[in-house]
Amino acid sequence: MNQFRIVADSSCDILSLDGADFVSVPLTIRTDTEEFRDDDFLDVNEMVTVLRSTKGRSYSACPNIADWTEAFGDSGDVIAFTITSSLSGSYSTACAAKKHCEELDPSRRICVVDSLSAGPEIALLIEKAQSAMCAGADFDDVCRDIQAYREHTHLLFALESMHNLAQNGRVNKLAATMAGVLGIRAVGQASSEGTLEMLGKCRGQRKTQEFLLHEMERLGCKGGSVRIGHCQNPSLALELCVEIQHRFPGVEVKSYPLRGLCSYYAERGGIMLGFES
């Protein structure tokens, strides 16, 4: 079996990977008075609570070049995954670290993948890389296959709150406040360019669920793997699991709590859904 290290920034929500040499590189969430490092010591629920009451600016900070260089290690081949470059500088710093490591040791091969997404969709890419590695695929073939596979994965999200997006200037504060008051959930997707694209608005959990299922069908889901990350919303995640299994027979679906960075964007009640087409 060809062995290589898999590295990803913490937007993937994965801290460890059974049977693989895996390293998570933390992003950081900051306010004027608090800092939350998205590692295995982070209390996500506490972070969510603090951010809900934050009146000032909040923002995320990407890993620096030294963080990525340390994660890549001193030798061996590496495939690395980052949150979409449209939301973060993580891809840029990872590429700079790749260049540095390959200059130190020209025999190394480091592939950095801009996921153009976050959370559950990155998890699917990582699982694909691990599966290919376990099957003994050549490193260069794995890198090509991941880029091709990325064309057939998607991310949908549904947000109960847009407080943090408003606090870091990504959405209008008045619109975010009104949506919260009216109980409107924003549903969107990661576009093919890696931007956040709003698709519609729903009121209530059932309508949100139906909207997500409809969008999965529209985007070509017929089965395969589905990953659902939630921020303090296990009930919707469970209902989605059941409905997805009913609507797409043979689908393999898993749900889990989001970690720090994705919980920052999804906020309490939010759902992120990655799937194949």
Task: Cite the ranges covered by each PLM segment.
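Mixed-charge interfacial surface used for oligomerization/domain docking
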Residues: 2-3, 11-29, 33-34, 87-90, ...
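Generic enzyme active-site microenvironment
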Residues: 7
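Class I S-adenosyl-L-methionine
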Residues: 34-103
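Short catalytic-loop micro-motif centered on adjacent basic/acidic residues
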Residues: 59, 80, 112, 227-228
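Glycine/charged-rich beta-loop-alpha catalytic/anionic-binding loops adjacent to active sites
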Residues: 76-80, 103-113, 255
